[in-house]
Amino acid sequence: MKPILAITMGDPAGIGPEITVRALNRKETYEKCRPVVTGDAAIMSQAVQLLGLNLQVNAIQSVKEAKFVYGTIDVIDLKCVDLLTFKFGEVQPQCGNAAFQYIKKAIELAMADEVDGTVTAPLNKEALNLAGHHYDGHTEIYATFTNTKKYAMMLADENIRVIHVSTHVPLRKACDLVKKARVIECVELIDDACRQFGIEKPHIGVAGLNPHSSENGMFGYEEAQEIIPAIEELQQRGFNVEGPVPPDSIFAKAKCGKFDGCVAMYHDQGHIPLKVCAFNWNKETGKMESASGVNITLGLPIIRVSVDHGTAFDVAGRGIANDSAMTLSIDYATRMAIYRRNKLKANCQ
């Protein structure tokens, strides 16, 4: 049986509805999974009309009512948006609240095992906070409603997968957060994630923190005191892990296939190479757009995969948004759901 995925519509004023519709207009999406949207049916219908597609929107209240057939988009209709005051491309508290409610509903469905995984379209953090929901983003919402204490963000495209020792902290503080225990935790998380993608024995590369991985202590001590001891312990436990690899070469090697996953020491060390590979320049809009990047939250009891781009208010409602990242997100979530199901069956035998 194909896995059921709950896809959140994202901020209604952004490109979330459009990229969701585009992804669900692909027949191959229904060949690998059974998607159901948590959102507003009226907004999804607007997106269908905007794109001029021959699709039907099936407004439902539960997963049991979904048809799961190509040509029909099943939407658990939460009716969060007042169409009389709604506008594309603007920060609106009602849209921030709507995006929050869509996420909350998807989490509830996954925690109740009514769906096998979740995929999220982008939200706007300003709108979210104006609505009274004070979170940094999706990841923190998921952590709160799944009661998860240890988690990490993994970015991925077709070639590179990267997890971060730290993310949204000042760079000065990030250096202090490079600790043996956290490096070990990150390798464990990305190793498990790669296995969920069907990689039997993942080869994990761990980046150094300092230039040239400190050149035997010439440019810093974090490698010798924290990173190398973590790698040695992991190797003794049987992990196929290598490092510290100089930060200026690890991602080039990963892109060429040497590593199945990488551990970055801080936010920009991991984000910059991924976005160089995953983002394209759109000449029509004069903007950068995500062609293939996805964001996967590791450590949760449920599956969460997201597009690695924002709401793109500047192009919302124009019918030109690229759905490649959404399509890839659905693919990753499907593979993870199948892996977890097979693992559960194996454990029960």
Region spans (language model):
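Active-site glycine-rich loop that binds ribose-phosphate moieties when present
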Residues: 140-149, 171-193
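Flexible loop/hinge segments that line or gate small-molecule binding clefts
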Residues: 137-162, 167-170
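Amphipathic alpha-helix from the class-I
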Residues: 167-175, 216, 318
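Residues in well-ordered beta-strands of folded domains
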Residues: 76, 154-155, 163-166, 297, ...
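Contiguous, glycine/small-aliphatic-enriched amphipathic segments in soluble metabolic enzymes
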Residues: 1-138, 181-205, 209-265, 269-295, ...
